[in-house]
């Protein structure tokens, strides 16, 4: 089942952390991890003006995979997570009728 989720990832301080993380996320390795969790073409990103954090709205098809990735336990992503990520929060999104 597909679920809409929101992720807020805060970066560790340091020069080039955002660029390094985004470079990995767009690499073949990063894209493989992302595709195993969510529909990449439906991802909506947003970046803080100072690049200290990034937000993603995701269409998740593998919630357990997202939890593994967000907790830093995905074996493929662990090195970049350990180097770049300070904290991650994940929320489920619900539509509101207006």
Residue positions per predicted region:
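Residue-level recognition of beta-strand termini and adjacent short loop/turns
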Residues: 48-50
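An amphipathic, aromatic/His-enriched active-site/gating alpha helix that lines ligand/cofactor pockets
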Residues: 24-43, 59-93
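Active-site-flanking beta-strand signature of metal-NTP-handling nucleotidyl enzymes
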Residues: 4-12, 55
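Hydrophobic alpha-helical segments with strong N-terminal bias
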Residues: 46, 55-58
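Short, low-order "capping/linker" segments at domain edges
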Residues: 94-98
């Amino acid at each position: 089942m597909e679920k809409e989720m929101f992720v807020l990832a805060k970066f560790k301080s340091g020069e080039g952390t955002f660029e390094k993380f985004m470079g990995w996320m767009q690499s073949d390795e990063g894209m493989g991890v992302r595709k195993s969790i969510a529909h990449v073409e439906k991802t909506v990103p947003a970046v803080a003006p100072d690049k200290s954090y990034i937000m993603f709205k995701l269409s998740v098809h593998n919630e357990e995979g997202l939890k593994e990735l967000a907790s830093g336990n995905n074996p493929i992503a662990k090195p970049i997570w350990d180097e770049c990520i300070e904290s991650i929060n994940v929320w489920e999104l619900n539509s509101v009728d207006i």
